[in-house]
Every structure is written in structure tokens, then in C-alpha cells.
């Protein structure tokens, strides 16, 4: 009986803790921040036209010629695009 009460109490504490973490995530949604505050954009996120460094990682480059989307979005770079980004000396990783 004592074990069941402890287990039930632990589950309640876990549920309350996970709810508060979700609330914080909703409040600080990285997609709602302007790109300058984010530092860099993940793949398939909006980026700055002509600035491959606005996309995170070595794999990301800014693509403004997507056939189904208006605007510029980060995409996975090809081999030559990766090399060009490496020589640009982007600060973000």
C-alpha cells in the first residue's frame, strides 16, 4: 500500500513538472524570434536572402528559389555549396 501511494505521488509530481516545461517552451518559441535574435535558422526555416551564414550548421544554405514557397528558406547544401560556406568563415555552427 505504501509503495502504491509513493508511486502515485511520483506520477503526479512528474505530470506537474512536465506541464510547466511545456509552458516555458510555448512562451519562448524560437520561431517567433526575429532571425537576428535566433543567431541562425535551422533547415526549412526562413533565412536572410544572399546570406548562407544565416543558416545553422555546415549543411545549411539559404535558398530563395523554392518552387512552392515564397521567400528564402534554409536547405541542405550540396558539396560545392558546403565548400563555399566553409570559405565564407561563418561564425555559427
From Swiss-Prot:
Keywords in alphabetical order: Disulfide bond, Secreted, Signal, Toxin
**Residues of the signal sequence?**
1-18
| CC annotations in GO | extracellular region
Highest taxon in the source lineage:
Eukaryota
Please list the residues that make up the propeptide.
19-38
Modification comment: Contains 5 disulfide bonds.
Give the primary localization class: secreted
| One example GO MF annotation | toxin activity
Q: Does the keyword Membrane apply?
A: no
Q: Where in the cell is it found?
A: Secreted
Give expression by tissue: Expressed by the venom gland.
Record-stated family = Belongs to the neurotoxin 31 family.
This chain's protein is named U12-lycotoxin-Ls1c
Amino acid at each position: 500500500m505504501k509503495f502504491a501511494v509513493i508511486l502515485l505521488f511520483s506520477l503526479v509530481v512528474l505530470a506537474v513538472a512536465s506541464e510547466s516545461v511545456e509552458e516555458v517552451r510555448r512562451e519562448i518559441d524560437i520561431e517567433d524570434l526575429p532571425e537576428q535574435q535566433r543567431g541562425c535558422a535551422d533547415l526549412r526555416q526562413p533565412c536572410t536572402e544572399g546570406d548562407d551564414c544565416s543558416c545553422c550548421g555546415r549543411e545549411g544554405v539559404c535558398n530563395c528559389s523554392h518552387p512552392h514557397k515564397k521567400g528564402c528558406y534554409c536547405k541542405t547544401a550540396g558539396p560545392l555549396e558546403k565548400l563555399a560556406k566553409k570559405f565564407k568563415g561563418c561564425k555559427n555552427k
